């Protein structure tokens, strides 16, 4: 077809219905559909799903306008009922026992015939229809396009979680559920409409399906329309993804029709390989490798998508879609799948409700794209330095003792600054905000920086920011503070105690933020000799930490080294400590869920004896790690939760273990997940139990760079003197500052905040407080770091 008469395309979208109070699936589709036009909005197998049918269009702009209009009407009608709408292959919060199959005769028969398949069909897909009225051509083209379906599936992957919230490890778990049905998968290689019709008749006659509409092949001639229908894709929260898939599928159909009519063979791929490639796409999405079925071999998803788009350039140019598809496909591969965004949302605070909220917002078109957040790759190790042969001079590091730098000496100015520091800190302390919710805190910092004449850069999402101060130089030194508080109810009774129930600055981040604000004031008045970046980071208290988001947003671009301070209640005010090498430990989370046959304790041989298997895992995994890992790495597994059973005379059917795994060695940390996975498999092999391992990688150790540690020591000595600089011990706690040091050299020091008289209050505890006199030492140390210059000796 020519561009003047391109094939028309239409879309069917399926949407989950979400209770906006609980964020769970709700079976209120009949109530919602009663408020909507029945020619566009229709029911589905489950009462928690609504299908929306677009019109047909020759241009993508018309299709987009249609989809936007129908989504908006659906979202608005649903919100009036307290219902949210989510376009995704699956959603993570549901109670399957509360779900109901739609009460029509057809769906009732499907429930009777397929039982658990129908009951567990809590999934949604996107179907794309392309004009192809010749049924003989349609059945042949369906077979010719089959090898390319994995790419379209990967682009749409949006179902990483099961309905119970468990991470499946797949990008499209919907595909796994869908392929359980007897008439799914790649289309049969038939050569005519008559042959295809005979196949469908045989399936109906066999009783496996009850009508032709239940032939759920990945691509099929539509039962009711003169179209070829794509059925392999997950529902897509973002309309850009729907348009990309629709444009690519239309171009692919056009190319294969042209090839069929010209007598050219299509790509010949065995069905087994096609099925394997579909599995890989469901497993990996856009984040790992896909299978190039033409070779065959594994290739990065971005390469395969790019080659696929380029192969369709003639058809895309004919329809006027080339530029748009190039842009959308580049964005998709750069920023990853919906499945990856959902895992990112969960990783920030560990809340599945955040995943649901993300899907609701994207479906409604209420969010802008956030930079993809991936764990930064390790920095290539450079030659180690011992600091020998180096001399260093200060750029007036202790300029507060000099009267010739300004009319007001540092001693005079700090009397004012200390009062401001206390004022700022107490304001932040009274208004704590949890990770990725630090909007007020960000606003306070932003207003302060703008008032100093600086130009802060706000991070996507509105929490966190950074700005530069000083001259434009080749070198840029970064200073980092964290903004977030903890879900800990404060019990200090202070006049400025937290006003937010259940939330407090129990880790001293209010002081960290205050000290960097103070440093900004000093550096603005007394400009440093080199450019300094002040990084106010959100969400340190999450896994893998807001540092990952901050790096992805560009805060380290152009930075040559980075420093940070952390409050330490084990050091008195006036003292600081640091060390070369690891100063914190890695911090991973291990969750094991177990299932087995339950029963009476009088007959344990008829059960899986899950309690015994759990005990073996509790003791055995620690023993395996003790024997397989060098003891000098201080790798420790600690179980914090072991739950199974209710009463003494009943063997339980399920149990759960949750623990943390920490290591002082970065190399050991990198090897822990496969070691734990293998050990659990072998420990539980003799027992008749099923299990699911959820291994959440946290942060690696903070490993202080030798040269940067030398900088930090000299800055500290210039502030508090040699006698007040201590050698830090390595903490078993974790700190996401480690991610910065995976990218650039840097170092962290601990700042003493104990007043030396009362009982030490530990970090993360309800009674934690700090001696505010410590903050001025922190400000001076941060400023001193900006006034060092290396000199070759």
From Swiss-Prot:
One of its GO terms (biological process) is modified amino acid biosynthetic process. Its EC number is 6.3.2.2. Keywords: ATP-binding, Ligase, Nucleotide-binding. Pfam families: GCS2 (PF04107), Peptidase_M20 (PF01546). Residues 367-390 are annotated as: Disordered. It catalyses: L-cysteine + L-glutamate + ATP = gamma-L-glutamyl-L-cysteine + ADP + phosphate + H(+). One of its GO terms (molecular function) is glutamate-cysteine ligase activity. CDD domains: M20_Acy1-like. Residues 408-793 are annotated as: Peptidase M20. Residues 1-407 are annotated as: Carboxylate-amine ligase. PANTHER family: METALLOPEPTIDASE, PUTATIVE (AFU_ORTHOLOGUE AFUA_6G09600)-RELATED, PEPTIDASE M20 FAMILY MEMBER. ATP-dependent carboxylate-amine ligase which exhibits weak glutamate--cysteine ligase activity. NCBIfam families: amidohydrolases, gshA_cyan_rel, PRK13517.1-1. In the C-terminal section; belongs to the glutamate--cysteine ligase type 2 family. YbdK subfamily. This is Putative glutamate--cysteine ligase 2-3. The lineage of its organism: Bacteria, Bacillati, Actinomycetota, Actinomycetes, Mycobacteriales.
